[in-house]
Regions:
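Donor-binding/catalytic cores of nucleotide-activated saccharide
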Residues: 33, 54-161, 170-182
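Membrane-interface aromatic/basic loop that binds lipid-linked glycans or pyrophosphate carriers
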Residues: 228-281
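Short, conserved active-site loop motifs that form the nucleotide-linked donor/cofactor pocket
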Residues: 22-24
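Amphipathic alpha-helical repeat scaffolds of TPR domains
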Residues: 210-222
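Short aromatic/hydrophobic "clamp" motif used to bind/position activated sugar donors
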Residues: 49
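Catalytic core of nucleotide-sugar-dependent glycosyltransferases
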Residues: 167-174, 180-206, 230-246
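A conserved acidic beta->alpha catalytic loop
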Residues: 2-12, 29, 53
Length: 281
């Protein structure tokens, strides 16, 4: 999908399509990441779907690794790990003892929300195309779209296969490291994500403690970027207060989420002050 690219990407896509008739190219006006994905999902005829962001790249055996897991465990979703690399550098190769397993969909969603093995990113995963036949699409016009979508796809699959090979390479831009500025769009997107997820409590109720931990990490991520005096700060604090005791008492919660939950009893200013001090060190 050429989502309104201003460089030669569209031409490059057309050249690839001439070399391989299986490749379909769609040229469209820029509509954002979710819109580009949805347009592709609507016209795909393949049996499987995977997503690769335009800045990232994968290993030569990316598809084969994920497909082999699906074949071996007879499931509809497979997940692998990823490397993160900074602009101008190369990913570090980490050699680990190979490990793979297969879990129920509920266990997989739990581990994803606890951020124990993998996270909610749409990439580094292979999905059977039938999972999208239920009407699942990525919410347009917002950021954090994967948080509101990936668990729904996993829930549609009875089982989920996983391996710890790092076959996806995610580019971390320098402005992301330095901290991109907070915007009203990010807050509006966060509220939309909450609204979308809360409309599926029939699913999330099965993993409520894990869901609360993931949302707590999400809320504190927003808080640390949010300027003091921001009008929706109190609304965010209200959501934090509603689940902080549950997260604080949950031994599977991330250490940072538990510490932040404890500090929140002393006010949001204390949370921001402590974490900014840690970052400077």
């Amino acid at each position: 999908v050429n989502d309104g690219s201003s460089d030669c990407c569209g031409k490059l896509c057309d050249e690839y399509a001439k070399e391989d008739k299986r490749i379909k190219v769609i040229h469209k006006k820029n509509g954002g990441l979710s819109d580009a994905r949805n347009v592709a999902i609507d016209v795909t005829t393949g049996e499987f779907i995977t997503f690769i962001d335009s800045d990232d790249y994968v290993t030569d055996d990316y598809i084969m690794t994920l497909y082999s897991l699906i074949e071996k465990y007879e499931c509809k979703v497979s997940i692998a790990l990823y490397n993160t690399f900074v602009e101008g550098s190369k990913p570090k190769v980490v050699n680990r003892v190979y490990r793979e397993d297969c879990q129920t969909n509920i266990k997989a969603i739990e581990e994803m929300f606890y951020q124990e093995k993998y996270d909610t990113a749409s990439w580094a995963k292979l999905y059977h195309s039938s999972l999208f036949a239920t009407g699942i699409r990525y919410p347009k016009g917002i950021v954090y779209e994967d948080l509101a979508t990936t668990y729904l796809l996993i829930f549609q699959s009875d089982k989920v296969a996983f391996c710890n090979r790092r076959i996806y390479n995610y580019l971390l831009r320098r402005d992301s490291i330095e901290g991109s500025s907070f915007s009203s769009k990010k807050m509006d997107s966060a509220l939309k994500v909450c609204e979308l997820m809360e409309s599926h409590l029939d699913i999330l109720g099965k993993v409520m403690q894990a869901y609360q931990c993931r949302m707590m990490s999400f809320f504190f991520h927003l808080l640390l970027k949010m300027p003091d005096g921001y009008e929706q700060r109190n609304m965010l604090y209200k959501r934090i207060k509603a689940i902080r005791w549950s997260v604080l008492c949950n031994s599977r919660a991330r250490k940072k989420a538990r510490v932040a939950s404890l500090l929140s009893y002393f006010g949001l200013g204390v949370v921001k002050g402590v974490f900014h001090l840690i970052d400077r060190r």
